[in-house]
UniProtKB/Swiss-Prot annotation:
The record marks E75 as: Plays an important role in discriminating NADH against NADPH. One of its GO terms (biological process) is fatty acid biosynthetic process. It comes from the Bacteria. The active site is at Y235. It catalyses: a 2,3-saturated acyl-[ACP] + NAD(+) = a (2E)-enoyl-[ACP] + NADH + H(+). This is Enoyl-[acyl-carrier-protein] reductase [NADH]. It comes from Yersinia pestis. Disulfide bonds: none annotated. Monomer.
Length: 399
């Protein structure tokens, strides 16, 4: 079939297998060009391995550190007449390139929040790797079914305490949109913490430790975003922020148990704002990102997922002098938080109107990166060619 982008709101409901493969190849080429990372992990579990930062971590571990990788994700395959998800095609491409390099790659498709998928993962580690020495936690999901109670939690993107006047960019109509976001109820805050907080990360590490599949000295990190004051009302001070603060609490207990396990470590890693399927769903982020891209590109400091994660590995996860803040988080977002960058974004924020969107922002760059996520708009791909949407992932365990 011939696959074209079909965008509905903040999601593209189609994905292009050849484009997704080219996108993965581009990230692998970046890591290969930057060179090997010393003292890297050799057996890595990536929870949330198919898109965005999780995919970038899997690529960096494999092609930067020479690691065998086991990936967990929840994606949909293509079938006749219907494309699969971009994460499915990304993972198929990753497996293909890892095999060419002689690297072990196995993936598990299912709900990472469930006990069943945790057990399948443990079984795969025991059978193939023995143990893992690094666990990357990079789940982005709007809902979670609690494995012990069966209760279904849905996350909410809302402020806490007071309603917030929100400036945003309607990416469909390409106009500036002013709206009022009502504050979250306590129940919505609790649900968001249940979905996006640290409980599941802790459950994973506890399960892996109990099963004896974490190597002594193993490290784990969960990815997060903090941002600056422009995004704080909806982000750090909002319901998502409550979940992020829960990560900061849960990491302390995880760190303690890993430290006792042969001197291991657990850290929250703070990464910059990038275009992902998760970030495009957050009100105000498309406008913020369009402005941030413009300012950072002009300064020559613009980075995407792979640049961020490669430097996180090289400098902090595997380096001797990690970028760490007072709370003990690893920081890779310092170029975004450069006061000069934030001041310029803040000034432009108030000046943007429908008439000057294309002059004051890099909305063109935002749209391009958004389509790239789904394998569209990639140089060298023939989008008029007939492609088979049914792409198999070798070494896939279906949960």
């Amino acid at each position: 079939m011939i696959i074209k982008p079909r965008v509905r709101g903040f999601i593209c409901v189609t994905a292009h297998p050849t484009g997704c493969e080219a996108n993965v190849k581009k990230q692998i080429d970046y890591v290969t060009t930057e060179g090997p990372i010393a003292n890297g992990p050799k057996r890595v579990l990536v929870i949330g391995a198919s898109t965005g930062y999780g995919l970038a971590a899997r690529i960096t571990a494999a092609f930067g550190c020479g690691a065998d990788t086991l990936g967990v994700f929840f994606e949909r395959p293509g079938e006749e007449g219907k494309p699969g998800t971009s994460g499915w095609y990304n993972s198929a491409a990753f497996h293909k390139f890892a095999a060419q390099k002689g690297l072990y790659a196995k993936s598990i498709n299912g709900d990472a929040f469930s006990d069943e998928i945790k057990q399948l993962t443990i079984d795969a580690i025991k059978q193939d790797l023995g143990q893992v020495d690094q666990v990357i936690y990079s789940l982005a999901s709007p809902r979670r079914t609690h494995p012990k109670t069966g209760e279904v939690f849905n996350s909410a993107l809302k402020p806490i305490g007071n309603a917030v006047n929100l400036r945003g960019l309607d990416t469909d109509k390409e106009v500036i949109k002013e709206s009022v976001l009502q504050p979250a109820t306590q129940s919505e805050i609790d649900s968001t913490v249940a979905v996006m907080g640290g409980e599941d990360w802790q459950m994973w590490i506890d399960a892996l430790l109990d099963a004896g599949v974490l190597a002594e000295g193993a490290q784990t990190t969960a990815f997060t975003y903090l941002g600056e004051k422009i995004t704080h009302d909806i982000y750090w001070n909002g319901s998502i922020g409550a979940a992020k603060k829960d990560l900061d609490q849960k990491v302390l207990a995880i760190r303690e148990s890993l430290a006792a396990h042969g001197g291991g470590d657990a850290r929250v890693s703070v990464l910059k704002a990038v275009v992902t399927q998760a970030s495009s769903a957050i009100p105000m982020m498309p406008l913020y990102l369009s402005l941030l891209f413009k300012v950072m590109k002009e300064k020559g400091t613009h980075e995407g997922c792979i640049e961020q994660v490669y430097s996180l590995y090289k400098d902090s996860l595997c380096g001797d002098s990690p970028h760490m803040d007072q709370e003990g988080r690893l920081r890779a977002d310092y170029k975004e938080l450069d006061p000069e960058v934030q001041n310029q974004v803040q000034q432009l924020w108030d000046q943007v109107t429908n008439d000057n969107i294309y002059q004051l922002t890099d909305f063109v760059g935002y749209k391009s990166e958004f389509l790239n996520l789904f394998g569209f708009g990639i140089d060298g791909v023939d989008y008029d060619a007939d492609v088979n949407p049914d792409v198999k992932i070798p070494n896939l365990i279906q949960g």
